[in-house]
Amino acid sequence: MSQRLKDHYNKTVVPQLMQQFQYKNIHQVPKIVKVTVNRGLGEAAQNAKALEATLAEIATITGQKPVVTRAKKAIAGFKIRKGMPVGVAVTLRSERMYAFLDRLINLALPRIRDFRGVNPKSFDGRGNYTLGLREQLIFPEVNYDDIDQIRGMDVSIITTANTDEEGRALLKAMGMPFREN
């Protein structure tokens, strides 16, 4: 499944972007470097079971074991001390990245209720795209009966694009369904 998106990039997207942006060298064409999936867990400090469930869930969705992110400093208002677990993150590259993106674009995003497309303004100014998902149930790997609580996650797509326009063109050519404003 991952090979499909990579082949689409090499055979269709690269020539299209070379023509659109008048690149002289094939290495100037933007490509996706990595995808990071992150979930902040405020209740992980008090509830160890939530952390275990999240680790298993993110591993199932991405196909890679996530790393536990810990608090850098103590914040009394949030009742956390330095070193307490506050979330999980996973960085996907190469084959797993393409497999995850393929599932995200073709399976998960269309399953969102009232989905009209993703926000085209969520670029960071350097061609990278960040997308917030409200629930984990949109992924077909997640079994509805196994989850204890609906939690969201952040998905960041890091590209070699220099501008938002190049990044948007790359992701649109890869099949990302952007909302028409």
UniProtKB/Swiss-Prot annotation:
Keywords: Ribonucleoprotein, Ribosomal protein, RNA-binding, rRNA-binding, tRNA-binding
PROSITE patterns reported in the protein's UniProt record: RIBOSOMAL_L5
BP term (GO), one: translation
GO cellular component: ribonucleoprotein complex; ribosome
Molecular-function GO terms, alphabetical: rRNA binding; structural constituent of ribosome; tRNA binding
One Pfam family from the record: Ribosomal_L5
InterPro entries: Ribosomal_uL5, Ribosomal_uL5_bac-type, Ribosomal_uL5_C, Ribosomal_uL5_CS, Ribosomal_uL5_dom_sf, Ribosomal_uL5_N
Family: Belongs to the universal ribosomal protein uL5 family.
Subunit note: Part of the 50S ribosomal subunit; part of the 5S rRNA/L5/L18/L25 subcomplex. Contacts the 5S rRNA and the P site tRNA. Forms a bridge to the 30S subunit in the 70S ribosome.
Name of the protein: Large ribosomal subunit protein uL5
